[in-house]
Amino acid sequence: MNEVLIQAFVNRIRAGMMTIEQVPIPYQKEVQERLNDD
């Protein structure tokens, strides 16, 4: 998977600019795991 894209989604969710539902489905699991790790 694209590390830069995943990290960008994580950063946007943390900043309140996106929700997990707005992340493309193929990336949702990885993004959710990274959010839960912190």
Segments (PLM) and residue ranges:
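Viral virion structural and adsorption modules
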Residues: 1-38
